A protein has these predicted regions:
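Structured C-terminal cap/extension of enzyme domains
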Residues: 34-38, 57-126
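Catalytic alpha/beta core domains of metabolic enzymes, predominantly
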Residues: 1-73
Length: 126
């Protein structure tokens, strides 16, 4: 940012629960948020990815600290303890329920595309 090589806001995606990486303890999540705050101040958007069985807990911890969340079968096959997810849509619905239970406003698909500066699948040439 200081050298002008990239423009704010940065998207900082922190990943939790990957073998050999940072764990899924609430202090791990708080540490990564504090580190991003120290490095980037208010010039970033924070999002988390919780791999495996901790996906929804990590999502809730992020939301409670003002962060965004990412869920999907590429990150976890589980919907909840002992229950395999049948689809990405099922995980998104579960995440929405968790976030709304925390009184967190959930972005619409169009709002999410704007936040992430994506053009949308109907405008991609693949």
């Amino acid at each position: 940012l200081d050298r002008g090589l990239v423009k704010a806001p940065l998207l900082v995606q922190t990943v939790f629960g990957i073998l050999g990486g940072i764990g899924t303890h609430p202090e791990d999540v708080a540490h990564m948020k504090r580190t991003a705050d120290r490095l980037f101040g208010d010039q970033y958007v924070w999002s988390v990815l919780g791999a495996g069985r901790s996906q929804m807990q990590i999502a809730a911890m992020s939301a409670a600290q003002g962060g965004s969340v990412r869920v999907g079968l590429e990150d976890s096959l589980w919907l909840s303890k002992g229950i395999l997810a049948e689809s990405n849509a099922q995980q998104v619905l579960k995440a929405r329920q968790v976030l709304e239970g925390l009184s967190v406003e959930v972005a619409t698909p169009d709002e999410a595309r704007e936040i992430l500066q994506l053009k949308g699948g109907n405008q991609a040439n693949f």
